[in-house]
């Protein structure tokens, strides 16, 4: 009768997310779902519950409706607050001028009580706590990476990708598509030398500085060190004030900057790992599922930061909103091959549907 879902799309590939969406759309019971995937919420939600200042506020509609309605509410609250502030200022001025004048003292006291009774409307916090930015990287060569006859995998007997021949050009913003287990992470690891090519070559352009983020990189964070300690380890000569200012843009302000990693949530650790990548000013970003564990505000801030990033990037993500906002080229990994995908995410969904139909037909033939 009731489905309680807590981040159900984490670690699912796009094919499985679409399957889950279709199931939830046809589900006749009640669904209470926590998710940071806005496109996912748009498909089946009829109401959004938002935690605001220790209260729950209900909005009718899906996530896109919620964004619009909340923006309208904020606008109206701001207008009301300006009117109330003007009224308060006028009343306060009256009190200051006449509170000690006998003929007006009683009126002034009444005005003071009115001021105490008047409660300012609490305007919803529309400002994101995150204001992240990837610094402009140093200008580099036109060919960032040249992949020739590349076989990727873990050994001669465990080759995942075969005969990859692709080139990454300065300014490229690549979204990697493919089902889980097809080799997206394997390709990323090979590009950043975590894995050696089984055969073939990966040639990086001169002066290329890679910024690599993956979920397993969180394990490389030292539990006893703070966010501030991690940046100090990278840049011994930096002033603490500058490091704190930078960390503040990732919402590590005040005591948060000195909190030990072992006491951080998964989302905070992911933010710190991204901060470390951003601080090093890479000219090639390799991002493997960067939005896992991130809340919607941080996802939006990351999307904005990546949209203005001037280096090249390759992104693995099942967050369609992020892919559509960032990637201007798509590479498809399927059945051990990597190739450019001519189409958008809607075309990719149709590609997946076609693959599923073909798979079912083969099963029926066997039966």
Give residue spans per PLM region:
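Flexible nucleotide-interacting loop at or near the entrance of a catalytic core
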Residues: 72-163
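ABC ATP-binding cassette signature C-motif
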Residues: 1-81, 137-367
């Amino acid at each position: 009768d009731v489905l309680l879902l807590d981040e159900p799309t984490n670690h699912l590939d796009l094919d499985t997310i679409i399957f889950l969406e279709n199931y939830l759309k046809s589900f006749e019971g009640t669904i209470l779902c926590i998710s940071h995937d806005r496109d996912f919420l748009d498909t089946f939600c009829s109401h959004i519950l938002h935690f605001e200042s220790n209260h729950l506020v209900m909005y009718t509609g899906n996530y896109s409706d919620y964004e619009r309605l909340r923006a309208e509410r904020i606008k109206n609250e701001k207008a009301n607050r300006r009117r109330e502030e003007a009224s308060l200022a006028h009343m306060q001025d009256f009190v200051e001028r006449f509170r000690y004048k006998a003929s007006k003292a009683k009126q002034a006291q009444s005005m003071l009580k009115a001021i105490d009774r008047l409660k300012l409307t609490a305007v919803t916090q529309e400002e994101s706590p995150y204001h992240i930015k990837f610094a402009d990287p140093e200008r580099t060569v036109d060919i960032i990476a040249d992949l020739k006859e590349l076989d990727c995998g873990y050994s001669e007997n465990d080759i995942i990708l075969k005969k990859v021949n692709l080139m990454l050009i300065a300014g490229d913003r690549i979204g990697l598509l493919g089902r889980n287990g097809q080799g997206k992470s394997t390709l990323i690891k090979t590009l950043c030398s975590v894995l050696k090519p089984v055969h073939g070559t990966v040639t990086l352009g001169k002066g290329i500085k890679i910024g690599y983020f993956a979920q397993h990189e969180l394990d490389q964070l030292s539990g006893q060190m703070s966010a501030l300690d991690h940046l100090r380890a990278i840049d011994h000569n930096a002033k603490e004030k500058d490091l704190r200012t930078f960390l503040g843009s990732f919402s590590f302000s005040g005591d948060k900057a000195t909190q030990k990693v072992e006491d951080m949530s998964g989302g905070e650790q992911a933010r710190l790992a991204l901060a470390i990548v951003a601080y090093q000013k890479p000219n090639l970003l390799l991002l493997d599922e960067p939005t896992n564990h991130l809340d919607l505000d941080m996802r939006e801030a990351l999307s904005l930061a990546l949209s203005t990033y001037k280096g090249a990037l390759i992104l693995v993500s099942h967050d369609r909103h992020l892919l559509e906002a960032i990637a201007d080229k798509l590479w498809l990994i399927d059945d051990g091959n990597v190739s450019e995908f001519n189409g958008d995410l809607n075309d990719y969904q149709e590609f997946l549907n076609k693959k599923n139909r073909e798979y079912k037909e083969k099963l029926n033939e066997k039966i």
